[in-house]
Amino acid sequence: LKNVTPLQMEKYQSAPFRAPMIIILTTQITDHPKVPKIEQMLSTATAAENILLALHAKNYAGIWRTGKFAFNKKIAEYLNLTPDHEVIGYLYVGTPTGTHKKIPQLDVDKFVTHWSE
């Protein structure tokens, strides 16, 4: 990292301790005539979403994070990942504190377009 303030460095150094467990999401990218790189990465993303759903079902909390360190080659080296692996994010896992956040009801018509009737 370049041009990092002391406050930013403190934030980065404390990030791994925000939760009692971190699941590092990696994808092994292989050349495949029928499965492009993006689909290989999205399959990992799909697995991560299912992990988050399972955590919630078991009354745990989880959040997906990325940021500078998710895509930093030095982190991949530190984790001893081979060059064909990419970190795509981190799942921070723990026990929820407080109550569930109330999510406002959205007007679906603002986000959905119907092409036919």
What are these regions (language model features)?
Residues 75-88:
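Short, electropositive alpha-helical surface patch
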